[in-house]
């Protein structure tokens, strides 16, 4: 099971998006991840996270259902398709596409980890990966420091 290393407790380290308003502080897609869980064949992935709006942390769990193309689909602030694209024991990088109720599309990158900020080298890789996804460097947010929600 390739996905065994995905399971467990994680924190969001960095988020990038081509629509910055969605992920800036208090943005609806600034997700502070806490836990990932897969069922046996990982056809379902459960993601538990907080969103912080008006200094209120609200905890949410969504279940992503694996699609034929390998992405997971779930509903949160619209329609989402996400997938892990890179995983090590320390970090997982997800790409995600959100289409909100107004039909606006946002492409995102989430980096989750074990409470450690990105090294300069990891940050550099993230900048390159963001560019490949047409996301400018200034839209990369290191969100670990702003995560004040319960562990």
From Swiss-Prot:
InterPro entries in UniProt: Calycin (IPR012674), Lipocalin (IPR002345), Lipocln_cytosolic_FA-bd_dom (IPR000566), OBP-like (IPR002448)
A GO molecular-function descriptor: odorant binding
Keyword Disulfide bond: yes
Tissue: Expressed in salivary glands, hair and urine.
Annotated GO CC locations: extracellular space
Annotated localization: Secreted
Family, per entry: Belongs to the calycin superfamily. Lipocalin family.
Name this polypeptide is given: Odorant-binding protein
């Amino acid at each position: 099971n390739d996905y065994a290393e995905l399971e467990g407790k994680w924190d969001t380290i960095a988020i990038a998006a081509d629509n910055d308003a969605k992920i800036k502080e208090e943005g609806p897609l600034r997700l502070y991840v806490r836990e990932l869980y897969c069922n046996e064949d990982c056809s379902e992935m459960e993601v538990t996270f907080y969103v912080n709006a008006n200094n209120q942390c609200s905890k949410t769990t969504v279940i992503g259902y694996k699609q034929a193309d390998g992405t997971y689909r779930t509903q949160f602030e619209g329609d989402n398709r996400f997938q892990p694209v890179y995983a090590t024991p320390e970090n997982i990088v997800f790409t995600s596409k959100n289409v909100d109720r107004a039909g606006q599309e946002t492409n995102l990158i989430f980096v989750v980890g074990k409470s450690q900020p990105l090294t300069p080298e990891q940050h550099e890789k993230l900048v390159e990966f963001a560019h490949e996804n047409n996301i400018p460097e200034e839209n990369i947010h290191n969100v670990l420091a702003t995560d004040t929600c319960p562990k």
